[in-house]
């Protein structure tokens, strides 16, 4: 690919990015990413987070979901966040930087959770996309499987789970596994999710031990 083509492609992306209504709105409201609107839309429909709850936020950086979660959970709530990337501090959020796929990071996260059960597990995790579906989709499905496994380890009875999933190979099987673990599972496509994206959010409530 020539430099000229790269420049043209980058310019189109930048134009789309800066013209994006949700990016501008996030900047105006002091939110760290447009992703914050996705969890706000889910919260508006499904009322997952209430004051005093303990929330785990996986794939948290740069912190859009954690910003929303800590506001909803309030002073008596608790938000524990994890990401492989660094994240600037958010008051009320206990952040762990590390690769969630690694056992030592999972152990450190479980230590921070402690003996108390968690009310909500959020996951906006996604792999670095290569553009090759046969590579990207298995990586994405592996992350959501780890997120569901986290639910099995820490979620309280009747707890909630919201997870980003990319439609494709393995999606139906994953949906089945989530339905087996929760009383109710809904598929959400927030308005703030770009229409061309294959991402959807599974919102599961009523965790069954």
UniProtKB/Swiss-Prot annotation:
Keyword Signal: no
Name of the featured protein: Ribosomal RNA large subunit methyltransferase E
CDD domains in the record: AdoMet_MTases
GO cellular component, one term: cytoplasm
EC numbers: 2.1.1.166
Location in or out of the cell: Cytoplasm
Biological role: Specifically methylates the uridine in position 2552 of 23S rRNA at the 2'-O position of the ribose in the fully assembled 50S ribosomal subunit.
Keywords associated with the record: Cytoplasm, Methyltransferase, rRNA processing, S-adenosyl-L-methionine, Transferase
Coarse class of the protein's main subcellular location: cytoplasm
Gene3D superfamilies, alphabetized: Vaccinia Virus protein VP39
Catalytic residues identified in the record: 164 (proton acceptor)
Family classification: Belongs to the class I-like SAM-binding methyltransferase superfamily. RNA methyltransferase RlmE family.
Catalyzed reactions per annotation: uridine(2552) in 23S rRNA + S-adenosyl-L-methionine = 2'-O-methyluridine(2552) in 23S rRNA + S-adenosyl-L-homocysteine + H(+)
Cytoplasm found in the keyword field: yes
Stored SUPFAM superfamilies: S-adenosyl-L-methionine-dependent methyltransferases
GO MF term list: rRNA (uridine-2'-O-)-methyltransferase activity
Residues that coordinate or bind S-adenosyl-L-methionine: 63, 65, 83, 99, 124
């Amino acid at each position: 690919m020539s430099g000229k083509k790269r420049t043209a492609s980058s310019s189109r992306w930048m134009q789309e990015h800066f013209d994006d209504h949700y990016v501008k709105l996030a900047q105006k409201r002091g939110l760290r990413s447009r992703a914050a609107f996705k969890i706000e839309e889910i919260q508006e429909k499904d009322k997952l987070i209430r004051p005093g709850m303990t929330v785990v936020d996986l794939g948290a950086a740069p912190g859009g979901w954690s910003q929303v979660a800590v506001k909803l959970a309030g002073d008596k709530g608790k938000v524990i966040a994890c990401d492989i990337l660094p994240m600037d501090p958010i008051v009320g959020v206990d952040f762990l930087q590390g690769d969630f796929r690694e056992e030592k990071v999972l152990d450190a996260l479980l230590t921070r959770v402690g003996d108390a059960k968690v009310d909500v597990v959020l996951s906006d995790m996604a792999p670095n996309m290569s553009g090759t579906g046969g590579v990207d989709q298995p990586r994405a499905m592996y992350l959501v499987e780890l997120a569901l496994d986290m639910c099995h380890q820490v979620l309280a009875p009747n707890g909630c789970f919201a997870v980003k999933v990319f439609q494709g190979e393995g999606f139906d099987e994953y949906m089945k596994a989530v339905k087996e673990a929760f009383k109710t599972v809904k598929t959400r496509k927030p308005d703030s999710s770009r229409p061309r994206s294959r991402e959807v959010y599974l919102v599961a409530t009523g965790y069954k031990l």
